[in-house]
């Protein structure tokens, strides 16, 4: 469950006060032009003292609206798939699948905003343009496990270059993307998932 909570910080991770409205709109416009995105990623996690605690790698696929496939292949094999309605998290080592409503994830992490156009969700966060991209932080009163999300775009319309997530404990997760394919058709099956036979299923999609 700890691995799932950590992943939700990121995925369920990418909104604005009036003073930052222009920056928020600029980020939304840039994300809106990203109809689909597929890449490999390398991950580095450091604690609040700056000490490395984990390194990993995997693949990511995003498609408008609200479709995500995130597979970590090292050090553990885990899969996170959202078809826009339901979200599936598969931990192959634990042989467990967790099923959630995608809409419930948006309130806890700004990452889902990468594929969301819902103004009500964006209003929960402040966006500030930086020298390297954009910084997203939850507004006061918004319950989020993410303290800050920094987004860097690649040049020449090559999509995302880097995401850096800082959680409430001060832990920092950095994701660097490479071999990206931008705005190319992705098969619908990319965002579909059928639990393997014999695995434990924890279905939280009905709010139980």
UniProtKB/Swiss-Prot annotation:
CDD domains: LolA
Signal sequence range: 1-21
GO biological process terms, semicolon-separated: lipoprotein localization to outer membrane; lipoprotein transport
GO CC terms of this entry: outer membrane-bounded periplasmic space
InterPro entries: LolA/LolB/LppX, OM_lipoprot_carrier_LolA-like, OM_lipoprot_carrier_LolA_Pbac
Gene3D superfamilies registered for this protein in UniProt: Lipoprotein localisation LolA/LolB/LppX
Feature: compositional bias, Acidic residues: 199-208
Keywords: Chaperone, Periplasm, Protein transport, Signal, Transport
Cited Pfam families: LolA
Main location: periplasm
Compartments (UniProt record): Periplasm
Region: Disordered, residue numbers: 188-208
Listed PANTHER family: OUTER-MEMBRANE LIPOPROTEIN CARRIER PROTEIN
Homology family: Belongs to the LolA family.
Functional summary from the UniProt entry: Participates in the translocation of lipoproteins from the inner membrane to the outer membrane. Only forms a complex with a lipoprotein if the residue after the N-terminal Cys is not an aspartate (The Asp acts as a targeting signal to indicate that the lipoprotein should stay in the inner membrane).
Subunit relationships: Monomer.
Protein name per its UniProtKB record: Outer-membrane lipoprotein carrier protein
Upper taxonomic lineage: Bacteria, Pseudomonadati, Pseudomonadota, Gammaproteobacteria, Alteromonadales
Gene: lolA
